[in-house]
Amino acid sequence: MKFFIFSDCHGFVGALEDALDKAGFDVNNEEHWVIGAGDYLDRGAYPWSTIRYLSSLPRKILVKGNHDDLILDMIKRGYPLGHDHSNGTAMTVMDLAPNAMTWEEACPAALKIIKPFTKTMVDYVELKNHIIVHSFIPVKILDGNESMYHTEGREFEYMPNWRNASTKEWKGARWGKPFDLCSKGLNQTGKTLIFGHYATEHQFAKDEGRRDFDYKARFEPYFGDGFIGLDCATAYSGKVGVVVIEDDFME
């Protein structure tokens, strides 16, 4: 089978469709599957269209991202916090509930649209030779700090039973910096890890010894040793990262 894997389209459905088309995706080919690595809606102007497009695909699997958690958290809370405004989450809720005048009206209206879309999302997809996650698999935290937002300079251990990690552990794993965690040797799955979450341009710039997002910025997938990064900073670049792999589902 051929898998078309993307991440972090953030409501830029046109860029997503263009990227899949350029990669050769054929919706009528039963050997073609689409796998999303999370963060589908907020920041872009077309969350409704993104939901409709992804929901229409007959063969797709959607991995949950940290921004997908954020929008559900805000709706459950009933009002936005500061990060909901800066991340575009609050605007996305309003886009999905255009007739609402208050957050009290907007949140339940948006939930009716988002809940069917998010309820089928999974924490990871495991193929015979690849594992697709939003950021990383759950790891054992050794310093007692449960937050995975900052991973540099911290110690972790590979968690052999990561497949059976708790909902809380998976939610935390969606925040880690995947390139840093890969550099710590924490992908001991024996398979190539494919992730989004963290813009590949940061790693390209680090490798090339330059300032990130300068005139040499690269918005494309990053192929490392045992891992592939997909996040092309779509809200900035207008590009969605897609890789095409040939693999099979686990038996």
Question: What residue ranges belong to the model's regions?
Answer:
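N-terminal active-site segment of His-dependent metallophosphoesterases
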Residues: 1-53
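Residue-level marker for buried hydrophobic side chains located in beta-strands
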Residues: 5, 34-36, 62-63, 131, ...
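Divalent metal-coordination and catalytic microenvironments
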Residues: 8, 39, 54, 65-66, ...
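Active-site environment of divalent metal-dependent phosphoester hydrolases
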Residues: 10-14, 42-45, 69-72, 139, ...
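Conserved beta-sheet core of the metallophosphoesterase superfamily
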Residues: 178-251
